[in-house]
UniProtKB/Swiss-Prot annotation:
One of its GO terms (biological process) is cytochrome complex assembly. It holds the Pfam family CcmE. Residues 1-8 are cytoplasmic. It comes from Aliivibrio fischeri (strain ATCC 700601 / ES114). This is Cytochrome c-type biogenesis protein CcmE. Its main location: membrane. One of its GO terms (cellular component) is plasma membrane. Belongs to the CcmE/CycJ family. InterPro entries: CcmE, CcmE-like_sf, NA-bd_OB-fold. It comes from the Bacteria.
């Protein structure tokens, strides 16, 4: 091979290695940022396709806070509570201030790391609310200037015009 072809081949190989490394690092970063969503039943029994999360895996779990399950530590901000859907209960441990809408019997989504088969150490807890929720300040302002909206059952279910 003449020197010109060697130089061109070296340049092509360097570009190929660089692009491959970049794509590999991007896929690795995307995989690290991916949190799979589970319900308590799916977490304990596995998803329909048979996959179960491994201990140490980052995930999100959603369900209802079980009444009477909230336990607060008197010396710190740590709170533990149980989340359930229609099946088994999963314990969520959270060290921080819970959202204002957090209540027993309320829907939540927690993001964290699986500690064991039925325990999650959460670093974020989000409280869910229904579509009719309105912050108290906004509701008070609306009362002063607007009449409340009266929805029919069809409209609430999204089937009415």
């Amino acid at each position: 091979m003449n020197p010109r072809r060697k130089k061109r081949l070296g340049l092509i190989l360097a570009l190929f290695v660089g692009i491959s490394a970049t794509v590999g690092l991007m896929l690795y970063a995307l995989n690290q940022n991916m949190d799979l969503f589970y319900t308590p039943t799916e977490l304990v029994n596995g998803k329909p396709d048979g996959t179960k999360p491994e201990v140490g895996q980052r995930l999100r779990i959603g369900g209802m806070v079980v009444a009477g399950s909230v336990v607060r530590d008197n010396n710190s901000l740590e709170v533990s509570f149980k989340v359930a859907d229609v099946g088994p209960q999963v314990t969520v441990i959270y060290d921080g201030i819970l959202p204002d809408l957090f209540r027993e019997g309320q829907g939540i989504v927690a993001q964290g790391v699986l500690v064991d088969a039925t325990t999650i150490k959460a670093h974020e807890v989000l409280a869910k609310h229904d579509e009719e929720y309105m912050p108290p300040e906004v509701a008070e302002a609306m009362k002063k200037t607007h009449e409340p909206l009266q929805y029919t059952e069809q409209q609430k279910q999204g089937t009415g015009q």
